[in-house]
């Protein structure tokens, strides 16, 4: 049974754990890891390439403390860096958020993550996986790239076979959206739409099923997105040990204009793998809530 914690507390606990405790699995020597003179992984070495010449993004990518990264702000012309599970904190002037969405985010934050999808065995939002304290794994092939999160074993598929992104509403909405990818030089560009988001017309309904209260979480603070969300992600591997993800959120129902931010992850180079993660649904203890005094 999965014990529920407020999302912020869970993120702090996971971030504080050393890798062997946060994701423990039998170690197996990892091939292709460049080593320095001291025999340790050289994370600043050049990134590997696949047989077709593209950057190889494969591997397990873990959270990295962004506290000391870019203390003076992002480089000129670059989007802000998200630190932790709160996207709002990356923007000095706040998010360009619609009034109803700001109210919903506040309610979700004040509930201390009661309806956070991860705490309710529901799929997280696609951006939540990027900022989650648990690792994710990328499996890269020429025709598909699989993005697998350790959290609830969330799976996203990036189709690389040249297909076009379907029209909005032409396919059923998906928790992880429908994603197609292409290479722009050494950058993987992924575009996604047809998400299962929150319905702004029903956010105040008292009898709304919990499954819908857990829909459309952009981050751990509950910044919402609707089924109008169009997501653009740019994955770049500047060196062996670093994965930089640039995300643009375009959702006119929830935000007054598109906005862009970055996340940085670090390769797991010690042979660790993701652990099996099973979350049991219909957890009765989630119903044992009472007003906080």
Question: Which positions does each model-derived feature cover?
Answer:
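Classic N-terminal secretory signal peptides
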Residues: 10-12, 16
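PEST-like low-complexity, intrinsically disordered acidic/proline/serine-rich tracts
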Residues: 3-6, 17-293
